[in-house]
């Protein structure tokens, strides 16, 4: 799965988050939030850790962050962040400014999950990201090492469950299962129709024999 973790925060107050697998990305993300510049100027940032990158979009004091596999590039993660920012602002509006930590999590974590799945697995997401990826601020985002940004003497270890692709595989399995059920349903329908036709033919032949002819002359005088 390309995008593994995401959160929405006001300053350092996390309002909603979702993780597609077992990882300590949440605690690392909170440290990133604490180290972001204090002003509320709009910005786009990326921080690398092993083969993962934390992408950050800050707009109007609202921060949207995601952790993605480095193979996802920049366009898809930032298109995802832009999408999430728009959805969050549209859904909660002014309530964002006074919301308590995780007060939107029960509802919006489902949106994060759905959009993470879409941007990680749906081919249409790549086309959308190419359009949004033309923004100069995305092209010019510098990727810094996260240990340098957090100014830690010891190496920060990111822990990610090796089964991180499970959700993507589950999504594909569900699609295949639905397709298989549809095929089996049509097969059963066709088989039922064929049995009805065969039964009708057998009844007709029997009646034709009893009624002395294909036009059933002795039965319909």
UniProtKB/Swiss-Prot annotation:
Membrane topology summary: Single-pass type IV membrane protein
UniProt tissue specificity: Highly expressed in stems and roots. Detected in flowers and leaves.
Cytoplasmic membrane side: 2-190
Vesicular side: 212-221
Record lineage: Eukaryota, Viridiplantae, Streptophyta, Embryophyta, Tracheophyta
Subcellular localization: Vacuole membrane; Prevacuolar compartment membrane
Biological role: Involved in the targeting and/or fusion of transport vesicles to their target membrane.
Organism field: Arabidopsis thaliana (Mouse-ear cress)
Name the UniProt record assigns to this protein: Vesicle-associated membrane protein 713
């Amino acid at each position: 799965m390309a995008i593994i973790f995401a959160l929405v925060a006001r300053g350092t107050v996390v309002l909603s988050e979702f993780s597609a697998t077992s990882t300590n990305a949440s605690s690392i993300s909170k440290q990133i939030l604490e180290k972001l510049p204090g002003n509320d100027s709009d910005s786009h940032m990326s921080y690398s850790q092993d083969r993962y990158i934390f992408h950050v979009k800050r707009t109007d004091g609202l921060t949207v962050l995601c952790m993605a596999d480095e193979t996802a590039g920049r366009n898809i993660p930032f298109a995802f962040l832009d999408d999430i920012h728009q959805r969050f602002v549209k859904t909660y509006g002014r309530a964002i400014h006074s919301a308590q930590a995780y007060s939107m999590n029960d509802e919006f974590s489902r949106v994060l999950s759905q959009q993470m799945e879409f941007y990680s697995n749906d081919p249409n997401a790549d086309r959308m990201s190419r359009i949004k990826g033309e923004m100069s601020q995305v092209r010019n985002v510098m990727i810094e090492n996260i240990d340098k940004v957090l100014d830690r003497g010891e190496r920060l270890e990111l822990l990610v469950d090796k089964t991180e692709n499970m959700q993507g595989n589950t999504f594909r399995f569900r699609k295949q299962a639905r397709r298989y059920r549809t095929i089996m349903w049509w097969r059963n329908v066709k088989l039922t129709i064929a049995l009805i036709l065969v039964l009708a033919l057998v009844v007709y032949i029997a009646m034709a024999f009893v009624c002395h002819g294909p036009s059933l002359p002795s039965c319909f005088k």
